[in-house]
Amino acid sequence: MSISNYKLQTKVRLQPLVLFQIIAAYERRPKTAKMAVGTLLGRRDRCNDIIEITNSYTVQHKEQQIGEMEQFKLDTQYASEMFELNQITYPQEKIIGWYSTGKSLSRSAAALHAYYSRECGDVQPLHLLVDTTLRGGHLSTRLYCGVTMGVPGGTRGLLFTLLPLLKLNTDGDESVALRLMQKQALHPTKQLGRMLPELVHVMEATRELEQKLELVMRYINDVLARKRRPDNSIGRALHDALTSVPLLDAESFRLMFNANVRNMLMSITLSTMIKTQMELSEKLSYLPDH
């Protein structure tokens, strides 16, 4: 293998969901585990040199220190079963590498690279290293690929090369949640951990949408009244935004909106019932047997 599989101009897009999954895996890891390890899933666009990391799942492993030797065992059967289950829901996602947490590369990186090289087929696996210690108040993420080094007929070695282009993709639906989290971080509420009802978020998003529509209408009216020079880029952006919205009459839109609201309320009701049932089961489990 060589580094030719990944050019320095290759754009790597990382979905924010993956970072949250890695952080959750680190927080939920067993007490005996020093780090969290898992599989990275995503898509490759070979024509445009774009790699998108869209999903991940944790893989169980065991770490054992015997003298100066550190043993690392990955549950490969569990990893295969998780990938098969993921393929049922997201068949377009393929294995593109693995992730681990820590300040630096672990001694098990070479063994993990060998395993994921077989899983990735004819391309090199990527390794995403996430420093969950938040040094300097920053979540550090580094992306590596393994390069085989050595002389022909001699001993071969593995060198992990840093891929400098790691772009966090915040252009999708996740941007709404990220903006809300950023708002809560900059202006925290007095009651920490308090979750607002879903309809409150819908009302805030609707209010923000109304403000943006007023801004757009003001711009259009100024252009029509020749108070402002038209901008072609803004015009194309408005055209793309309008053409992306399906043309519906008021009655069809009302029915569709009410149906979505009913589905959301039903989901809230079911999740509340499940939460109540789990709390009751937990309390009943502590009752003494008679």
Curated annotation (Swiss-Prot):
PROSITE patterns: MPN. It is found in: Cytoplasm. Residues 12-150 form the MPN domain. SMART domains: JAB_MPN. GO terms for biological process: formation of cytoplasmic translation initiation complex. Component of the eukaryotic translation initiation factor 3 (eIF-3) complex. The eIF-3 complex interacts with pix. HAMAP family: eIF3f (MF_03005). Component of the eukaryotic translation initiation factor 3 (eIF-3) complex, which is involved in protein synthesis of a specialized repertoire of mRNAs and, together with other initiation factors, stimulates binding of mRNA and methionyl-tRNAi to the 40S ribosome. The eIF-3 complex specifically targets and initiates translation of a subset of mRNAs involved in cell proliferation. This is Eukaryotic translation initiation factor 3 subunit F-2. It comes from Drosophila virilis (Fruit fly). The lineage of its organism: Eukaryota, Metazoa, Ecdysozoa, Arthropoda, Hexapoda. The gene is eIF3f2.
